[in-house]
Amino acid sequence: MKNLLKSGLVVIIGPGHNGGDGAVIARELFLKGYIVSVWCPFQIRKTLTIKHLSYITSLGINILSNAPDPEKNELWIDAVFGNNQTRSTDSNLIELFNEKSKTNKGKIVSIDIPTGLNPNS
C-alpha cells in the first residue's frame, strides 16, 4: 500500500449502496493520506450514496469526469455492483476492467462482486 501514496488509487462507484461503500472506502483512505480519485459512470440512485459522494467531494477528493486510464500504475477499487445486482453491466465498463486486468499497471480489488461477473451464475 505504501507505493499507492505515490501512484494513487481510483474507486469506481456504482449507483447503489455498493457505490456508497466505495465512497466510504475512498474517504477513509484519503484521510489516511492516500492519493484517491473517484469515478462514477452512473446516475446515483440511493440517497445515502448521494450523501457520501457529496461529503467526499467536500473533502477535496478528486472526482473524475472521464474513465480512469488502465495504463496508469494505480489500484482500482471496484465498488460498482453488489450481490443484489438487477441491471445488466455496460459492455464498455466491462471492457475497461478487462483492459486494466491485462496490464501490469496496478491491480483491481472488488469489494463485493467483480464487475462483469453475474452474481446469479
Where are each of the predicted segments found?
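Conserved alpha-helix/loop element of class I SAM-dependent methyltransferases that forms part
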Residues: 1-3
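Glycine-rich phosphate/dinucleotide-binding loop and adjoining beta-alpha-beta core of small-molecule
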Residues: 5-121
